From Swiss-Prot:
Compositionally biased spans, kind Polar residues: 72-82
Protein name: Outer membrane lipoprotein RcsF
Assembly: Interacts with DsbC.
Signal peptide positions (record): 1-15
Keyword Lipoprotein: yes
Keywords linked to the UniProt accession: Capsule biogenesis/degradation, Cell outer membrane, Disulfide bond, Lipoprotein, Membrane, Palmitate, Signal
Biological source species: Escherichia coli (strain K12)
Membrane topology reported for the UniProt record: Lipid-anchor
Gene: rcsF
Highest taxon of the lineage: Bacteria
An example Gene Ontology biological process: cellular response to cell envelope stress
Disulphides: C74-C118, C109-C124
Entry-linked InterPro entries: RcsF
Effect of C124S: Does not activate the production of capsule polysaccharides
């Protein structure tokens, strides 16, 4: 009597192993596939804006005045780092580049206090120029 259940279990196991199974195929995702966007071309690098400190350096060079340009560096409170004139000059160059200028004639750079929102502020002012090659 004990042999009967053992024989039945052995028969069932061998019967199941004889079944042929097809390999499982991966389930297709219902989420939309991200579309491959074409690579965006990198923005052209802006040409460097040269700073002239003396108007005599421009004698003999044809140029067009594009208007006044400025840059600033702000110290919000007395615990912040002090305002930097080199940072103000760099920001002036960036603003001139946005005006399609390739040079700036620097008029003045100074550190002031009492500007709303700033404990102290460095400001540089100049003229944005487009110098053409001869």
């Amino acid at each position: 009597m004990r042999a009967l259940p053992i024989c039945l279990v052995a028969l069932m196991l061998s019967g199941c192993s004889m079944l042929s199974r097809s390999p499982v195929e991966p389930v297709q995702s219902t989420a939309p596939q991200p579309k491959a966007e074409p690579a965006k071309p990198k923005a052209p690098r802006a040409t460097p804006v040269r700073i002239y400190t003396n108007a005599e350096e421009l004698v003999g060079k044809p140029f067009r005045d594009l208007g006044e340009v400025s840059g600033d560096s702000c110290q919000a409170s007395n615990q912040d780092s002090p305002p930097s004139i080199p940072t103000a000059r760099k920001r002036m160059q960036i603003n001139a580049s946005k005006m399609k200028a390739n040079a700036v004639l620097l008029h003045s750079c100074e550190v002031t206090s009492g500007t709303p929102g700033c404990y102290r502020q460095a400001v540089c002012i100049g003229s944005a120029l487009n110098i053409t090659a001869k």
